[in-house]
Amino acid sequence: MDKLKIALQYIMPKHLLSRLVGKLAAAELGAVTTSVIKWFIKQYKIDMSEAAQSAPEAYASFNQFFTRALKPGIRPLCDDDDYIVHPVDGAVSQCGPIKEGRIFQAKGHEYSSLALLGDQADDAKRFEGGDFATIYLAPKDYHRIHMPIKGTLSKMTYVPGELFSVNPLTAENVPGLFARNERVVAIFETEIGPMAMVLVGATIVASIETVWAGTVTPPTGKKVFTWDYPTEGPEAITLDKGEEMGRFKLGSTVVMLFAKDALEHFADGVEPKAVTRMGQAFAKID
């Protein structure tokens, strides 16, 4: 059955399906939308007591529900300045060192940081010998993405690609998954050096948004797009630790890269399959 699920992903029209689901998720269909939201809450056992708006009827579209805000204070930030924090609610897929420019995906699978970053060689060099962490957001999770540490945006890259599912089964069976899927790479300058936050698209992920650019929707095609941002002056985009930096519409994966010697060690309990909560201690900084 698992082999069949993987095989179907290779042949299904993933981009067409994702566009269709995206339109449906954005539609405001009144009672129909509310019924779908109620089914989703029950199916995935979502704790709506954490949401700023707990009633399904409060959301005009499925997208509004999926990108729902949490109640203030429900995810307190780790107040130890020696630690950066988890950027999302999810589960750790993998974490560890970047070895000779390679990132571990799953048993028998790895990919290059160069490919992940859209073949931007200068960017990849900045993370040689550093560390990475991959966090998977399941459908039940809170889908806003926050800053692990205060940072100033220096570059954004949009990389077109496939839209395979990014669940654990696919990660274990599709080579180079996160460097094959459509993604948005945001590079920040921080007190511990450069940090890359790679927001990876997936099947039925309607779009990826950032707080500075909105929905990232370059023209369709195979071209990589890059944007450079000033890191000083009134136009610099600086986000505080814990501040929202983006969101997924229908969920996916975040891959983070850190420079060599930026992290002393990952926090206790940060290991594959560990559940993460935004704001909890993620890694001790060097």
UniProtKB/Swiss-Prot annotation:
Known partners and oligomeric status: Heterodimer of a large membrane-associated beta subunit and a small pyruvoyl-containing alpha subunit.
Keywords: Cell membrane, Decarboxylase, Lipid biosynthesis, Lipid metabolism, Lyase, Membrane, Phospholipid biosynthesis, Phospholipid metabolism, Pyruvate, Zymogen
Residues annotated as site: Cleavage (non-hydrolytic): G251, S252
Catalytically driven reaction(s): a 1,2-diacyl-sn-glycero-3-phospho-L-serine + H(+) = a 1,2-diacyl-sn-glycero-3-phosphoethanolamine + CO2
EC identifiers of the protein: 4.1.1.65
Name under which the protein is recorded: Phosphatidylserine decarboxylase proenzyme
Membrane topology: Peripheral membrane protein
Requisite cofactors: pyruvate
Broadest EC class assigned to this enzyme: lyase
Function of the protein: Catalyzes the formation of phosphatidylethanolamine (PtdEtn) from phosphatidylserine (PtdSer).
Molecular function as annotated in GO: phosphatidylserine decarboxylase activity
Disulfide bond annotation, renumbered to this chain: none
InterPro entries: PS_Dcarbxylase, PSD-B, PSD_type1_pro
Modified-residue entries (Pyruvic acid (Ser)), positions: S252
Record text on cofactor binding: Binds 1 pyruvoyl group covalently per subunit.
NCBIfam families xrefs: PS_decarb
PANTHER family found in the cross-reference section: PHOSPHATIDYLSERINE DECARBOXYLASE, PHOSPHATIDYLSERINE DECARBOXYLASE PROENZYME, MITOCHONDRIAL
Active site: D89, H146, S252
Listed pathway(s): Phospholipid metabolism; phosphatidylethanolamine biosynthesis; phosphatidylethanolamine from CDP-diacylglycerol: step 2/2
Subcellular location: Cell membrane
Family named by the database record: Belongs to the phosphatidylserine decarboxylase family. PSD-B subfamily. Prokaryotic type I sub-subfamily.
